[in-house]
Every structure is written in structure tokens, then in C-alpha cells.
């Protein structure tokens, strides 16, 4: 099937990454990409085992992640970027993100990077410095996962404070 083929391609790409010397793998599960499309009730209108309930919507991303994890060397670090909220009624919310992060942890995910949005046409995103840090904090508080915060974090002093305040374990700084 197409889904099985895509899963195999992810496994193959992950193994190539290890072979050429990558230090870790992060699966992109947000911003409207494939796994986000499965996870989001805004985009997933399937009526099979991959649609409907949160359990079903998580199924394919978890299957692919588990297949990658199983193929990698035993302690090779692998994480996933997840959506903390879609900023849209009826979309992924913090509670679903917590459940998904806990399910990832059960299958050996080493960390999650908590982002947001990406699937709604007109989300009401309160964009400002550090606007997604509270999402990382929510995931950190409700899971045992290592959590990375993102979102307009450009000041190294603030980045350090996020870690000191235990809002996240890691901080991504870019742009």
C-alpha cells in the first residue's frame, strides 16, 4: 500500500542518516506536513483506522515512528517535532498534544520539540517573542519527555532562563 511504502521510505532515509554520520533524527510532525495531516482533525477526514478518534489519528505517525525506532541502532537519539496547538477550534489542542507525546514516549521517543499551527487557514496566533514556550511547558509538566521549546527565542539570556525555570529542557534558536 502507499502508506506502507511511505513508512518504508522514512525507515530507509533514517538508516541513510545514521550511515552518513548524523547525530540524531528528528521527525517533522507539525506545520501541515504528512504526520500533522494525520493528527489534525482539521485535515484528517478519513473513515478508516487512521481517521476519526485521536487514537486512530495518532496511529500512522506512531506506526512510522516505531518502525524507524526499531530499525535504528539501540540508543540512537530520535525525537519528533509536534504541534502543541493549532490555534483553531476543532484542531489539535494541548490535551491532544500531551496524549501524543506520552504515546511517543511509550515507543522510545527521546524528546519532543513543541511547535504550533500550520494546518488552519486563518489561525489566531498570538505571535510575539517566546509565544510557544508555554506549550513546551505544558508538555514538560504532563509527560516525562525531554522537551525543546521553539518560537521567536532569539535572546540567549531568555533561552537560558527558559531552561533554568524548567519550562523546557532544550531551546531552539534560529533566524
Language-model-detected regions and their locations in the chain:
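Flavin-dependent oxidoreductase catalytic cores
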Residues: 1-175
